[in-house]
From Swiss-Prot:
Belongs to the glyceraldehyde-3-phosphate dehydrogenase family. This is Glyceraldehyde-3-phosphate dehydrogenase. It catalyses: D-glyceraldehyde 3-phosphate + phosphate + NAD(+) = (2R)-3-phospho-glyceroyl phosphate + NADH + H(+). Pathway: Carbohydrate degradation; glycolysis; pyruvate from D-glyceraldehyde 3-phosphate: step 1/5. Keywords: Cytoplasm, Glycolysis, NAD, Nucleotide-binding, Oxidoreductase. GO terms for cellular component: cell surface; cytoplasm. The lineage of its organism: Bacteria, Bacillati, Mycoplasmatota, Mycoplasmoidales, Mycoplasmoidaceae. The active site is at C157 (nucleophile). It is found in: Cytoplasm. Its main location: cytoplasm.
Length: 337
């Protein structure tokens, strides 16, 4: 890994929604430099999609393309178009971290191709295929990363929103069991119009339907908060918004805190990555947020019947920007190892 007194060199494999937003975020980081991008799309198209973003607005930088060089103001970035990560020149460019954001190389075997190409570490911007790969959520368990971890998963956007809620409730009150629901903006995995898809619900037009589908966040939470392993299940409702989502967590607790006590526990956990919100916000208010999770204190509630209590807590997130800033925090943390 990079020495602590020098800038770490990053390559991005896959320049889609996450890859481009990671690039935007890293432009402002003094200790991190994006050296290269690998994507099968033509560089001119990548440049256009980097500059103009329907959800997050225009990138106010001068962007040009010459041969296989993407130039942003005075900064030059190499653009490669290689299907096999093992053939990428990561050793030649002294790459410290590869951000693997294609969604294709999420197994240990796939991600390790970047290591074989000379990269020193790989951070997967998705849940990993194997549980043996360390899964981290910044500000919940990121300090478990060691210098020996060469492949890391930054989990999913929903897990990054859910994990602080589970961590706080488990630590302060103990979770017996529960379920979670994410009301989630539609994504590129869905169909714009009715068209074939392995998931028949995702086959339906994303912009005009509420689409029930799966989420791995509830089961993956045990990789981040081990004490909650096996205690949660959940699902997703994809809805017709471009970005901006909310998690509902319903749990039975070992203790019997009041709404105020639950909220105060969340407030104590607030940080640069976890916001405690007292305003009556809606999804558009969290678009482009840098917080991984935004706790909505106004929505905390309890249902009590015959002495049994069901607790509901809610947190917002921009399923693109919130996740990207969490991932970038993990990258910056790895630079210190």
């Amino acid at each position: 890994m990079a020495a602590k007194n020098r800038t770490i060199k990053v390559a991005i494999n896959g320049f889609g929604r996450i890859g481009r937003l990671v690039f935007r975020s890293l432009l402002s980081k003094a200790n991190v430099e994006v050296v290269a991008i690998n994507d099968l799309t033509q560089p001119e198209v990548l440049a256009h999609l980097l500059k103009y973003d329907s959800a997050h607005g225009e990138l106010k930088r001068k962007i040009t393309v010459k041969q296989n060089i993407l130039q942003i103001d005075r900064k030059k970035v190499y653009v490669f178009s290689e299907k096999d990560p093992q053939n990428l020149p990561w050793d030649e460019h002294d790459i410290d971290v590869v951000i693997e954001s294609t969604g294709r190389f999420v197994s240990e075997e796939g991600a390790s191709l970047h290591l074989k190409a000379g990269a020193k570490r790989v951070i997967i911007s998705a849940p990993a295929k194997e549980k043996t790969i360390r899964t981290v959520v910044y500000n919940v368990n990121h300090k478990t990363i060691s210098s020996d971890d060469k492949i890391i998963s930054a989990a999913s956007c929903t897990t990054n929103c859910l994990a602080p809620l589970v961590h706080v409730l488990e630590k302060n009150f103990g979770i017996v069991y529960g379920t979670m629901l994410t009301v989630h903006a539609y994504t590129a995995d869905q169909r714009l119009q009715d068209a074939p898809h392995n998931d028949l619900r995702r086959a339906r037009a994303a912009a005009v339907n509420i689409v029930p589908t799966t989420t791995g966040a509830a089961k993956a939470i045990g990789l981040v908060v081990p004490e909650a392993n096996g205690k949660l299940n959940g699902m997703s409702l994809r809805v017709p918004v471009l970005t901006g989502s909310i998690v509902e967590l319903s749990v039975v607790l070992e203790k019997s805190p009041s709404v105020e006590q639950v909220n105060q526990a969340m407030k104590r956990f607030a940080s640069a990555s976890f916001k405690y919100c007292e305003d009556p916000i809606v999804s558009s208010d969290v678009v482009s947020s840098e917080y991984g999770s935004i706790f909505d204190s106004k929505l905390t509630n309890i249902v009590e019947v015959d002495g049994m209590k069901l607790y509901k807590v809610y947190a917002w997130y921009d399923n693109e920007s919130s996740y990207v800033h969490q991932l970038v925090r993990v990258v910056s943390y790895c630079a210190k190892l």
